[in-house]
């Protein structure tokens, strides 16, 4: 038996007026998912227990079998683990987004956060932004004085590590939760280190806003990459062995460092797929084949994560969100099943949205999310479809960190 955990990041939503009161899941054409739903079990679960905010760092840690109340120590250490960055005692890791602020000569505090990702900047463009900052004497000196180092990545998601960083009382705000709002309303606060981070963010804008790199982006009709935003700090994190907890081995397939990092800290293989971007242009076929190839080995577990529905929602792209959900069905799940069926492989599936990402706000929501359990060749007689309404009408799993026990069959709904 093979076990497949499929996470459609942020695909659950609330009813959308533009869709006639339907959710994107209800509007999407997902025949393979609904085939599973009709023969499986559809229920609901809270993946982000209070008092934690709704976010993938809590939700996916929970879905992957770790109670966040026991194991969560910040988002960025898990992202750092995906890059092989090992935090020392006293080190603090931060997520550092390359962002797009309003293209205006207004004071920094009045500039609106236009894009949490500078228009999904990636590749050499993302690396160039980091190079520009590192080569600027004033910014470089401020980083050195703060005891900070930035680790470049070819996406908008960067990692900054600070030696002996003071996070007692520090408050940092996720930029994707405040799109369209003035930056000055959400700057770091809470302690002296907040002023250090505040200064770095303002310096970055000063360096980047009129740089020839951004002049070229404007000329090309792209969102200027004219700022950075530090958030999601955390200290060194240790997670229990996945094999030790469940007796299963396998890997994680994702275009997002957070998910790979959680897998790595649990002793799972991080499977890198070329072109897996964490956006709707991700390499669907590569991720699909990597899943099949993994399950053709002695490994019996695969976590397949698709970030695209979440990013489309943050970007205000409702058609893109629906398209991403449909491609999850047609370009990932359907061909995976076809190849496993040809191989004669038995499999069980857990499909879930890690959290809701709301079209109305372009932000996350901590309401219960639907999940689907399916086993090849079995028929529960449910006869329904997979969406938020059928999930809420179905059984409740008490805690997100128990979900994998239902996938592995050690618990039943």
Q: What is each PLM-predicted segment?
A:
Residues 1-413:
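Feature captures the catalytic ectodomains and active-site-proximal regions of enzymes
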């Amino acid at each position: 038996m093979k076990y497949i955990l499929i996470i459609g990041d942020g695909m659950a939503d609330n009813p959308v007026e533009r869709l006639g009161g339907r959710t994107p899941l209800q509007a999407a054409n997902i025949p393979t998912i609904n085939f599973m739903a009709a023969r499986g079990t559809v229920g609901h679960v809270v993946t982000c227990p209070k008092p934690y905010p709704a976010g993938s760092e809590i939700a996916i840690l929970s879905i992957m079998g770790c109670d966040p109340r026991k194991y969560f120590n910040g988002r960025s250490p898990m992202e750092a683990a995906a890059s092989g960055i090992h935090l020392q005692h006293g080190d603090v890791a931060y997520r550092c987004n390359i962002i797009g602020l309003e293209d205006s000569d207004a004071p920094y505090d009045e500039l609106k956060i236009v894009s949490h990702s500078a228009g999904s900047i990636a590749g050499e463009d993302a690396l160039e932004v980091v190079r520009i900052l590192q080569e600027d004497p004033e910014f470089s000196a401020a980083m050195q004085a703060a005891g900070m180092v930035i680790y470049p990545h070819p996406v908008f998601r960067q990692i900054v590590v600070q030696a002996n960083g003071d996070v007692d009382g520090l408050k940092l705000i996720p930029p994707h939760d405040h799109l369209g709002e003035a930056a000055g309303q959400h700057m770091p606060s809470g302690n002296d280190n907040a002023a250090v981070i505040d200064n770095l963010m303002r310096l970055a804008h000063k360096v980047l806003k009129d740089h020839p790199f951004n002049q070229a982006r404007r000329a090309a009709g792209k969102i200027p990459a004219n700022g950075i935003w530090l958030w999601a700090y955390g200290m060194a994190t240790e997670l229990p062995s996945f094999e030790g907890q469940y007796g299963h081995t396998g890997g994680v397939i994702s275009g997002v460092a957070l998910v790979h990092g959680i897998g790595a800290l649990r002793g799972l293989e991080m499977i890198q797929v070329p072109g897996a971007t964490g956006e709707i242009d991700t390499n669907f076929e590569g991720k699909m084949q990597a899943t099949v190839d993994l399950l053709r080995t002695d490994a019996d577990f695969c976590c397949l994560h698709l970030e695209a529905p979440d990013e489309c929602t943050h970007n205000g792209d409702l058609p893109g969100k629906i398209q991403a959900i449909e491609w999850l069905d047609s370009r990932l799940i359907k061909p995976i099943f076809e190849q496993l069926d040809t191989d004669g492989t038995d499999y069980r599936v857990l499909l879930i949205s890690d959290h809701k990402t709301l079209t109305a706000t372009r932000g996350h929501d901590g309401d219960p999310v639907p999940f689907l359990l399916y086993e090849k060749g079995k028929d529960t007689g449910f006869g329904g479809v997979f969406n938020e309404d059928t999930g809420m009408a179905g059984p409740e799993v008490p805690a997100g960190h128990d979900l994998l026990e239902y996938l592995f069959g050690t618990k039943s709904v």
